Amino acid sequence: MKRQSERDSSPSGRGSSSSAKRPREREREAEAGGRRAAHKASGGAKHPVPARARDKPRGSGSGGGGHRDGRGTGDANHRASSGRSSGSGAGGGGRGGKASGDPGASGMSPRASPLPPPPPPPGAEPACPGSSAAAPEYKTLLISSLSPALPAEHLEDRLFHQFKRFGEISLRLSHTPELGRVAYVNFRHPQDAREARQHALARQLLLYDRPLKVEPVYLRGGGGSSRRSSSSSAAASTPPPGPPAPADPLGYLPLHGGYQYKQRSLSPVAAPPLREPRARHAAAAFALDAAAAAAVGLSRERALDYYGLYDDRGRPYGYPAVCEEDLMPEDDQRATRNLFIGNLDHSVSEVELRRAFEKYGIIEEVVIKRPARGQGGAYAFLKFQNLDMAHRAKVAMSGRVIGRNPIKIGYGKANPTTRLWVGGLGPNTSLAALAREFDRFGSIRTIDHVKGDSFAYIQYESLDAAQAACAKMRGFPLGGPDRRLRVDFAKAEETRYPQQYQPSPLPVHYELLTDGYTRHRNLDADLVRDRTPPHLLYSDRDRTFLEGDWTSPSKSSDRRNSLEGYSRSVRSRSGERWGADGDRGLPKPWEERRKRRSLSSDRGRTTHSPYEERSRTKGSGQQSERGSDRTPERSRKENHSSEGTKESSSNSLSNSRHGAEERGHHHHHHEAADSSHGKKARDSERNHRTTEAEPKPLEEPKHETKKLKNLSEYAQTLQLGWNGLLVLKNSCFPTSMHILEGDQGVISSLLKDHTSGSKLTQLKIAQRLRLDQPKLDEVTRRIKQGSPNGYAVLLATQATPSGLGTEGMPTVEPGLQRRLLRNLVSYLKQKQAAGVISLPVGGSKGRDGTGMLYAFPPCDFSQQYLQSALRTLGKLEEEHMVIVIVRDTA
């Protein structure tokens, strides 16, 4: 009855009832109305908030029962305050006040939020919600709209090459229910991530004609659960509601609905009705700002826990996340280049581990331990070349499934040496700065650093000094406030080719930051991941994306120091190293190979050179004499023997003619070329000249091919360079080496005992060189530097007791097992490496008279020196090696 009488009362009575309220209650009502208005503007929960019992009699209006629905039930106080300012208690006025913000309408100072900031210009970075300072930082980019049909490795390589130009990155693939296949690109510095995103906004990225979507993943400002920033972007899937948590200062869109990310709830149902004390005004302000951001198209910006990405993304769906913070190498004192890989299958092989991890860096050693059944799973230790490679592999592969189990990765124990690897250097770091900071721990022997590189090698005289420097200098700021050093131990016996600190040339450096080997031929452009080639934005319709020329670290260092004025192609796997060597006084074998390449490069073209036309016009009878193995392609290749060595396999008619024209030994070749004789006359003339050029009883290549049945017989036709034992660990391999090209004096001067001066009979392989293109280029550069009398190339075959030149074969020392050479070749093939021996054995007192020996198994690099044998025998089935001996230049 009391409520009915109040409903029938006059407007004056309603006004007097409202004016009789206490000031404290009016303030509470205005505060609640502002909170509801902000929550509705941000797309928040529309849950009914029950009015206080003592306020019900005062909430009268002329709207009748229509204002007692779900919307009007929680707005009694709001309508009361609105009625005081407007002079009427209409429900429509109450709703209008709710939409426009009641604190201002009631004459009170607004306590919810200032007006939203103006929208940023197109392409600019969005401002942090609720902050007037700089934009929020992010180090991770989310790449979506990826094709589900592309192989994972191929997709990773393409994305890696696109984004690595902006800085040091790590990349992982994942799959989400909402976006499908996605990729996360992590940058070390926020400015690198921002630059990459701005580049993606300016130029549309395509992957096989499919536009990619690039979005930032913001660093988290605080923990908690999330809500939508606008009601218009509600998700289709809603996860189970989580426990209530404090409101986060950022209002943003979460990324994945069904994943176990440490994110806030997708649905407003799970959020409390904004009744947390003291923090509600800030939450409302941030909600308003988030709504304004959504109005200008920023609702797709995401904010996830940054470290949660390292643990969760790319993990198989359904595996629990490991809540573990991944420290950077400069902050983690336990970080080393050795990784422990746990929870492996007992059947896992070294090949599987290398295939999974080698994309992140050079793996020097793999050790797999398989405990007995019932005593735990298998585990392994992987030794990378440096700390950056190990950390990149640890971050990227943690939780990945190898075999049937998700693996666990941690750092192994360090192997202290006197040599340190120092990473994280700035582009302006100098040798003087490195020496000044590191010499306080002890005497420094060498510093290997190229200005502009991000790493250096420092060798101490004592192990204690190296250990002290490694412990104290990790995390030391050098080169700027945003750069801190990453220090770890490196192989003490390896040395880079010196650039400034040491004047004399040293053996080829083994510390190139390479990633990708000859085993994966389609990943040749992925050789150097820490050194970014200046690729343009790739187009996936361009099939040469992975075949483009760029400069590797070894080549860039050579160019910076002006050691040689030449350029090389990183894709070259044979003698394709220099474009204009004729004016440098190189020996004729190099010129011949260069000219042979220029001829062979015309294969498959519609236009043919006169040389090819002459080859096609030869008679059918002559073609039958050559046999089926003498193809036109082989006939166009040239014999690349040295000037003083006449090889019996150069009886190919076209090759003899072309080789004679290059050397200029027979002037009547030009007369025969200009003669008007017919085809038969020219063929007979060439046969006659071939016989004159090679004073051997064999007149037809067919007879010679039948005589030389294998590579050992072919080697007997060459000059013997050395015979003895190659030693690897506890095995020795009797070997005979015959000279393919080069100087005999290099062999006699370097392959001798330094103490007694006698000829060496045993060579021990102590190091390995990975068959990576930058390292092969470095070997070729050293060969070029040693020309014409500073190198030798030999063919190594199995030495037989009855073979020619094996009468001086030494006896096997006790403790060594005699094995066939094919076992050594198989070992090097499996390791994808070449054997390395420092010459002379035992060291040298001075800098003169030193060199290196490289023992290459059959590979693309070694095949360039066996073209003559390949033409003669057709195919090389016998196991062999190509030995390259290079003398160091002063």
UniProtKB/Swiss-Prot annotation:
Pfam families: RRM_1, SPOC. Residues 86-99 have a biased composition (Gly residues). The keyword Nucleotide-binding does not apply. There is a cross-link at residues 213, 702 (Glycyl lysine isopeptide (Lys-Gly) (interchain with G-Cter in SUMO2)). Residues 10-20, 226-237, 647-657 have a biased composition (Low complexity). The modification Phosphothreonine is found at residue 532. RNA-binding protein that acts as a key regulator of N6-methyladenosine (m6A) methylation of RNAs, thereby regulating different processes, such as alternative splicing of mRNAs and X chromosome inactivation mediated by Xist RNA. Associated component of the WMM complex, a complex that mediates N6-methyladenosine (m6A) methylation of RNAs, a modification that plays a role in the efficiency of mRNA splicing and RNA processing. Plays a key role in m6A methylation, possibly by binding target RNAs and recruiting the WMM complex. This is Putative RNA-binding protein 15B. InterPro entries: Nucleotide-bd_a/b_plait_sf, RBD_domain_sf, RBM15B_RRM1, RBM15B_RRM2, RBM15B_RRM3, RRM_dom, SPOC-like_C_dom_sf, SPOC_C. Component of the WMM complex, a N6-methyltransferase complex composed of a catalytic subcomplex, named MAC, and of an associated subcomplex, named MACOM. The MAC subcomplex is composed of METTL3 and METTL14. The MACOM subcomplex is composed of WTAP, ZC3H13, CBLL1/HAKAI, VIRMA, and, in some cases of RBM15 (RBM15 or RBM15B). May interact with NCOR2. Interacts with NXF1, the interaction is required to promote mRNA export. Belongs to the RRM Spen family. It comes from Homo sapiens. Residues 1-133, 219-253, 547-705 are annotated as: Disordered. Residues 22-34, 66-78, 573-616, 626-646, 671-703 have a biased composition (Basic and acidic residues). Residues 139-219, 337-414, 418-492 form the RRM domain. The modification Phosphoserine is found at residues 109, 113, 265, 267, 552, 556, 562. Its main location: nucleus. Keywords: Host-virus interaction, Isopeptide bond, mRNA processing, mRNA splicing, Nucleus, Phosphoprotein, Repeat, RNA-binding, Transcription, Transcription regulation, Ubl conjugation. Residues 722-890 are annotated as: Interaction with Epstein-Barr virus BMLF1. One of its GO terms (molecular function) is RNA binding. Residues 711-889 form the SPOC domain. Residues 113-124, 238-247 have a biased composition (Pro residues). It is found in: Nucleus, Nucleoplasm; Nucleus speckle; Nucleus envelope. Ubiquitously expressed.
